[in-house]
């Protein structure tokens, strides 16, 4: 039987939804990569009684490892370490070496500031150097150290900020205490296929057929997710079940090959960035208000290929900034393929790019008509060599959904245009 784990995400701000939980899903993925079965993810506030209740619940479920995130700071409501110590039956002790390391970090953070009482600050942070007796201390990334407390179950305590938690995780998995806790793990492989342009119902039908016809299908653990208008198919399996996965992949290619854009989990954003090497791109956006250009520039190194972007929400801006003829808008409407093409042409000329993408649409909630309801979005990808692709789609969802899905459609139109040479 595989080792089992549970996750406790702490923080009233997470529990109430003011802050989105990024740690639980991230830790879950890392556990699955290690071959550890995830039993539960729980979220609770900062009260020690609530944290301890979650720890006891997971222990009663028979998990081998509990991972907590949050509550390691110097303030009064940061009580996770003390709660874990009590749960594990360990005394809190002052680690003087850790206290000095934290003091050194604080001194570097303060720099030359003279308006802060360093001794008072150090005393306030002494709490972070109190660790459960017998625990393995994980070097702080910020000022908060993590700890691994061996036992049944073993408890790994990590800080809340993802920028601190993620590098600390890599250290934690190398500790003897954690490796011992997950020693019973089963080795798994995990593969991801990404699709675009296929309805979930089409994929569901194929998976039903695979379940009926593929020998060994029950050895594959498959999860599907619709994200940003794309379908993700994640398959986890033991190494000797790889032939079964290969048969499934062959079936997916045979039925939905045109929809598959990634068999290694790579994002369309990564693919577009690679395809733009040696080229430059410009964007012209209306209803998405710069979301496409933001997505393009999220990638490090995007300055090598992003020439410029224009957000032309008003019709007058389309005319003045991109040179879209006013009579074209009058004849066809701002949300039309001719206007999208003119916007792309204007962006191409204004920024001197090799390729341009334009988006114009009705995101809602108002503005729709019988002929052009809310969700109608027009796209154009134009190349400097004269090749052009235009599309009109009707996207479901609310305003936010339409805008986000529009950027995804644009990225895939761009990907296909660039792949065509």
UniProtKB/Swiss-Prot annotation:
Pfam families membership: CinA, MoCF_biosynth
SMART domains: MoCF_biosynth
Annotated InterPro entries: CinA, CinA-like_C, CinA_C, Competence-induced_CinA, MoaB/Mog-like_dom_sf, MoaB/Mog_dom
HAMAP family the UniProt entry points to: CinA_B
UniProt similarity note: Belongs to the CinA family.
Protein name listed in UniProt: CinA-like protein
The organism of origin for this protein: Mycobacterium sp. (strain KMS)
């Amino acid at each position: 039987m595989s080792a089992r784990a549970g996750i406790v995400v702490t923080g009233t701000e997470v529990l109430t939804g003011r802050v989105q939980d990024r740690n639980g899903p991230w830790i879950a993925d890392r556990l699955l990569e290690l071959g550890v079965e995830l039993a539960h993810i729980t979220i609770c506030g900062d009260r020690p009684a609530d944290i301890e209740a979650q720890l006891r619940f997971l222990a009663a479920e028979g998990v081998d490892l509990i991972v907590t995130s949050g509550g390691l700071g110097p303030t009064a409501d940061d009580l996770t370490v003390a709660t874990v110590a009590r749960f594990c039956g360990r005394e809190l002790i002052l680690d003087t070496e850790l206290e000095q390391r934290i003091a050194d970090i604080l001194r570097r953070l303060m720099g030359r500031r003279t308006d802060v009482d360093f001794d008072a600050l150090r005393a306030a942070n002494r709490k972070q150097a109190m660790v459960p007796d017998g625990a393995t201390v994980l070097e702080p990334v910020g000022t908060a150290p993590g700890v691994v407390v061996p036992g049944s179950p073993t408890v790994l305590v990590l800080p809340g900020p993802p920028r601190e938690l993620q590098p600390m995780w890599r250290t934690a998995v190398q500790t003897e205490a954690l490796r011992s806790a997950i020693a019973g793990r089963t080795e798994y492989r995990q593969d991801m296929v990404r699709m675009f342009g296929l309805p979930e119902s089409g994929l569901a039908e194929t998976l039903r057929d695979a379940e009926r016809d593929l020998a060994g299908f029950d050895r594959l653990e498959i999860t599907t997710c619709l994200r940003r208008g794309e379908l993700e198919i994640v398959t986890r399996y033991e190494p000797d079940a790889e032939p079964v996965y290969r048969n499934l992949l062959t079936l997916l290619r045979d039925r939905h090959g045109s929809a598959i854009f990634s068999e290694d989990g790579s994002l369309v954003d990564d693919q577009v960035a690679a395809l733009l090497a040696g080229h430059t791109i410009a964007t012209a956006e209306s209803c998405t208000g710069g979301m496409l250009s933001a997505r393009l520039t999220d990638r490090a190194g995007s300055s090598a290929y992003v020439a410029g972007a224009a957000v032309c929400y008003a019709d007058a801006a389309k005319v003045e900034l991109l040179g879209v003829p006013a009579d074209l808008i009058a004849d066809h409407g701002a949300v039309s393929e001719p206007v999208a093409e003119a916007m792309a042409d204007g962006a191409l000329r204004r920024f001197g790019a090799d390729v341009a993408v334009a988006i114009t649409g009705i995101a809602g909630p108002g503005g729709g008509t019988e002929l052009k309801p809310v969700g109608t979005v027009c796209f154009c990808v134009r190349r400097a060599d004269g090749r052009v692709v235009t599309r009109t789609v009707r996207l479901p969802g609310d305003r936010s959904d339409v805008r986000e899905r529009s950027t995804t459609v644009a990225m895939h139109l761009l990907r296909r245009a660039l792949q065509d040479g």
